[in-house]
Amino acid sequence: MAAYKDLEQQYGQTMEEHSFLPDPENRRYGSMGLCWRHSSRQGGGFFWTYGQQDLYTIKIHDFFFHEDQLLEFHWPESLSVTWYESISGEEFSPCRRLVPGCVKSFIGGREPYRALIHRHIPIVSIGVEITPAYYRDYLRRQFPEEYQSLLESFQTLDQTEHFPEMVQ
């Protein structure tokens, strides 16, 4: 139950601002993690998260909007990689299209993430967000000889449609 409280504390305010409410009994994506339900005049669907201490969070997006939505999030410092099965829209910084079938990286803790999401196109994706405690500390301790900066790797990934290891 402590994990649910941590997830609610981390995402709760942002989710509520976008009409998502905690749905802790929902087991749609498994018994672990926390699911939020979006059911309003704006759209519908689910957002699910599972976090492991302060190391990483797995996220599933499965929702839609009836009208175009401008979203803005202030992410904490983290490295995020997400595969989009379905999406349509534009990111603003850097300016690029959001298209299905691509893998995108995002580095949190810098500037706010801003995107325009197009109406009636479901956002269906799965992503992993890695915290500094994991990519700076844990990996360096576990693999001192092989350790390379994940931050540098994420900066080079950016956006690609060729990442078979992630989508198989």
Where does each model-flagged region fall?
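Feature targets compositionally biased, intrinsically disordered low-complexity regions
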Residues: 32, 43-44, 88, 100, ...
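Functionally constrained cores in energy, signaling, and assembly domains
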Residues: 56-59, 69, 85, 101-104, ...
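Residues in flexible loops and secondary-structure boundaries
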Residues: 58, 66-73, 89, 114, ...
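Glycine- and acidic-residue-biased ligand/ion/polar-headgroup-sensing regions
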Residues: 65, 75-94, 132
